[in-house]
Amino acid sequence: MRAVVQRVAEASVTVNGEETGRIGKGVLVFLGVGPDDGSGDIRYLSEKIVNLRIFPDASDKMNLSVREVGGGVLVISQFTLFGDCRKGRRPSYAGAAPPELARRLYGEFVEELKKQAVPVATGMFQEMMRVHLVNDGPVTLLLDSRKVF
């Protein structure tokens, strides 16, 4: 399971002109699911994201988590995080989970985040989305539950 995590001042997502999710201060998470992912990957990434100390404290040091600052999490499904661009000019997405599995694990990931006592908003799985965000920092991190990077 892979995630791009961005610290944001605010973020929202629309599908077919309708807003499906919005947060103020918090983190925007683009989530990709791999074919071998499961509950361990969900637990690892959800706990990591909620507890990452990427928000400034009173001394302006990145020392606080999204939970500690009362922020929200906006989760967007993003199978392209498993795109392989090493050969040719068109990415291969063979490394991504099949849609049925990815949909189930995406939903379980969102539910696990909600158990972490943070407000969670989402896009819509397997839909074209417009994501609007205001980066804060910017702070952008790449996470992989298999610790590839």
Swiss-Prot record:
It is found in: Cytoplasm. One of its GO terms (cellular component) is cytoplasm. Its main location: cytoplasm. GO terms for biological process: D-amino acid catabolic process. A motif (Gly-cisPro motif, important for rejection of L-amino acids) lies at residues 137-138. It comes from the Bacteria. GO terms for molecular function: D-tyrosyl-tRNA(Tyr) deacylase activity; Gly-tRNA(Ala) deacylase activity; Ser(Gly)-tRNA(Ala) hydrolase activity; tRNA binding. It catalyses: glycyl-tRNA(Ala) + H2O = tRNA(Ala) + glycine + H(+); a D-aminoacyl-tRNA + H2O = a tRNA + a D-alpha-amino acid + H(+). Its EC number is 3.1.1.96. Keywords: Cytoplasm, Hydrolase, RNA-binding, tRNA-binding. InterPro entries: Daa-tRNA_deacyls_DTD, DTD-like_sf. A Gly-cisPro motif from one monomer fits into the active site of the other monomer to allow specific chiral rejection of L-amino acids. HAMAP family: Deacylase_Dtd. An aminoacyl-tRNA editing enzyme that deacylates mischarged D-aminoacyl-tRNAs. Also deacylates mischarged glycyl-tRNA(Ala), protecting cells against glycine mischarging by AlaRS. Acts via tRNA-based rather than protein-based catalysis; rejects L-amino acids rather than detecting D-amino acids in the active site. By recycling D-aminoacyl-tRNA to D-amino acids and free tRNA molecules, this enzyme counteracts the toxicity associated with the formation of D-aminoacyl-tRNA entities in vivo and helps enforce protein L-homochirality. Belongs to the DTD family. NCBIfam families: D-aminoacyl-tRNA deacylase. PANTHER family: D-AMINOACYL-TRNA DEACYLASE 1, D-TYROSYL-TRNA TYR DEACYLASE. Homodimer. This is D-aminoacyl-tRNA deacylase. It comes from Syntrophobacter fumaroxidans (strain DSM 10017 / MPOB).
